[in-house]
Design a protein with these regions (language model features):
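Conserved mixed alpha/beta catalytic, RNA-binding, or beta-rich assembly cores of soluble enzyme
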Residues: 3-173
């Protein structure tokens, strides 16, 4: 059976998301926010419509991460733009997950050895904010932490694969 590139990306994305959303998580994840904003996976994409993501939110239910919507291309515009900018700086980056957490969680990520870059998404476009953050980092960041929200920090964990993102999450959970 032969698949087109979009079909292959869709199939691999479904497989990756299935592993991620069925994965048991530490009880501390509930203390983080109770819900993820989303996750995106790309394969040589050049626009947000070519990035597979969960439509709606990913939530923690009974200790498991579950998706509230279907996985489809173009579902998560905001995180798709973040991923596209990260891919321009490092073409190996293909995946990200975004969630909200208390500011202390950022310290835990730094203590775990992850490269964390602090940003404020207020005035600039998403693309410009991500470009500036990456350029100001000592090395390519594992995590972008947006301090703009007064209640919680918006955290974006970047990786080459969903497994890479999960391994970075495991370092702090």
């Amino acid at each position: 059976m032969t698949f087109t590139l979009p079909e292959m990306v869709q199939r691999s994305s479904f497989s990756c998301f299935s592993r991620i959303v069925r994965r048991p998580v530490a009880s501390t994840i509930r203390a983080i926010s109770g819900q993820y904003s989303g996750m995106a996976v790309s394969n040589d994409s050049s626009c947000a419509e070519e990035i597979a993501a969960v439509d709606k939110r990913i939530v923690v239910h009974n200790g498991l991460v579950k998706k509230n919507g279907q996985i489809r291309f173009g579902a998560a515009e905001h995180i798709s733009f973040v991923l596209l900018e990260a891919m321009k700086a490092d073409p190996d980056i293909r995946c990200l997950i975004e969630f909200s957490a208390p500011e202390e969680f950022v310290e835990n990520m730094e203590d775990a050895g992850l490269e964390v870059t602090l940003i404020r998404k207020r005035e600039e476009s998403i693309a410009e904010t991500v470009r500036t953050a990456i350029a100001s980092s000592r090395k390519f960041p594992d995590v972008l932490a947006d301090l703009s929200n007064k209640k919680n920090v918006t955290i974006e964990v970047l990786g080459k694969t969903p497994a890479d993102v999960l391994s970075k999450m495991d370092m702090v959970l």
